[in-house]
């Protein structure tokens, strides 16, 4: 009776389930837990493991990429330093070649200037000699004509005329040199 009374009291309490309901609920929970544990939980664990592996792989890959990027950066810096060194060397060579070229061009200009001056002096000397020769002939002709008029005889003989002119001009040159 006590059990009946307890059962009657229990029926009255809605918070305490009846034993058959409790057993059925526990069995259903165990079946659902077993099915979830055998079927769903391995899939969830598999997905979580794949995600963890992907994250770790991503981290490892990021670390490897960081190391590779650092290596590439060092190579870039080394190449940049080498390029700067090469540019400085080429600039120095260009300056040296430019200085050499300027020196050569100055020497060539000096040589050409000397040649032009020498040619000018030679031309002046040739012109002076030609002018002196022309003057000598003109003075000789005038002197012969004047001498012929003074002497009263013709100095038409060419050989005689040349001798007289030469003597006259030689005398003038001697006087000119004596006055200097």
From Swiss-Prot:
Transmembrane segments: 15-35
MF-aspect GO terms: proton-transporting ATP synthase activity, rotational mechanism; proton-transporting ATPase activity, rotational mechanism
Subcellular location, record wording: Cell membrane
Cellular component GO terms held in the UniProt record: plasma membrane; proton-transporting ATP synthase complex
InterPro entries noted in UniProt: ATP_synth_B-like_membr_sf, ATP_synth_b/b'su_bac/chlpt, ATP_synth_F0_bsu_bac, ATP_synthase_B_chain
Keyword list, A-Z: ATP synthesis, Cell membrane, CF(0), Hydrogen ion transport, Ion transport, Membrane, Transmembrane, Transmembrane helix, Transport
Membrane topology value: Single-pass membrane protein
Chief localisation class: membrane
NCBIfam families: ATP_synt_b, PRK05759.1-3
Protein family membership: Belongs to the ATPase B chain family.
Function summary: F(1)F(0) ATP synthase produces ATP from ADP in the presence of a proton or sodium gradient. F-type ATPases consist of two structural domains, F(1) containing the extramembraneous catalytic core and F(0) containing the membrane proton channel, linked together by a central stalk and a peripheral stalk. During catalysis, ATP synthesis in the catalytic domain of F(1) is coupled via a rotary mechanism of the central stalk subunits to proton translocation. Component of the F(0) channel, it forms part of the peripheral stalk, linking F(1) to F(0).
Assembly behavior: F-type ATPases have 2 components, F(1) - the catalytic core - and F(0) - the membrane proton channel. F(1) has five subunits: alpha(3), beta(3), gamma(1), delta(1), epsilon(1). F(0) has three main subunits: a(1), b(2) and c(10-14). The alpha and beta chains form an alternating ring which encloses part of the gamma chain. F(1) is attached to F(0) by a central stalk formed by the gamma and epsilon chains, while a peripheral stalk is formed by the delta and b chains.
HAMAP family: ATP_synth_b_bprime
Annotated protein name in UniProt: ATP synthase subunit b
Gene expressing this chain: atpF
